[in-house]
Amino acid sequence: MIELLKKIFLVDLFQGLFVTFRNQNPKYIYTEQYPAERPKVAERYRGAPRLNINPDNGETLCISCNLCALACPENLIVVTSERSEVTKRKELVTFTYDTSRCMFCGLCEDACPVDALELTQDFEMASYTREGQIWDRQALEEGPRPTQYKC
């Protein structure tokens, strides 16, 4: 008998509508307007890699020790160097980093003795090709450029 009265008076319908209208209050809405408003990431977030540059002379801080490549469990970092005749030190020739295979563990960053390589808080690394995911030295020094959307 009670079930029949509930069906007649549409109790279930009104309970559902009550829940819907109760959650229409703007203070309960958690939608982010992503392209217009960039989300804040956690302080310890590890995102896009970057090769740091010495601000005094504009050269890279990398000393070509290859420790980052050895520490990487995915073997995605390739460092090549040459010994300079003038300074008798190793100089960085190429530095490639495959972001498509990276799991952003931070082991390469921890292994670097001069803090030349760091994982930034940038998270927009999408590209249309696989070749766009392989960053060379110049791309790593510049860092990712966030896409500018027109709103």
Curated annotation (Swiss-Prot):
EC number: 7.1.1.-
Subcellular location: Cell inner membrane
Cofactor note text: Binds 2 [4Fe-4S] clusters per subunit.
Annotated InterPro entries: 4Fe4S_Fe-S-bd, 4Fe4S_Fe_S_CS, NADH_quinone_OxRdtase_chainI
GO CC annotations on file: plasma membrane
Membrane topology: Peripheral membrane protein
Top-level enzyme category: translocase
Cofactor list: [4Fe-4S] cluster
Signal peptide, first to last residue: none
UniProt domain 4Fe-4S ferredoxin-type: residue ranges: 49-82, 93-122
Record's catalysed reaction(s): a quinone + NADH + 5 H(+)(in) = a quinol + NAD(+) + 4 H(+)(out)
Binding site for [4Fe-4S] cluster 1: C62, C65, C68, C112
Keywords attached to this entry: 4Fe-4S, Cell inner membrane, Cell membrane, Iron, Iron-sulfur, Membrane, Metal-binding, NAD, Quinone, Repeat, Translocase, Ubiquinone
One MF annotation (Gene Ontology) recorded for this entry: quinone binding
Binding site for [4Fe-4S] cluster 2: C72, C102, C105, C108
Disulfide bonds: none
Family from the record: Belongs to the complex I 23 kDa subunit family.
PANTHER family reported in the protein's UniProt record: NADH DEHYDROGENASE UBIQUINONE IRON-SULFUR PROTEIN 8, MITOCHONDRIAL, NADH-QUINONE OXIDOREDUCTASE SUBUNIT I 2
Function according to Swiss-Prot or TrEMBL: NDH-1 shuttles electrons from NADH, via FMN and iron-sulfur (Fe-S) centers, to quinones in the respiratory chain. The immediate electron acceptor for the enzyme in this species is believed to be ubiquinone. Couples the redox reaction to proton translocation (for every two electrons transferred, four hydrogen ions are translocated across the cytoplasmic membrane), and thus conserves the redox energy in a proton gradient.
Record HAMAP family: NDH1_NuoI (MF_01351)
The name this protein goes by in its record: NADH-quinone oxidoreductase subunit I 2
Protein's organism: Solibacter usitatus (strain Ellin6076)
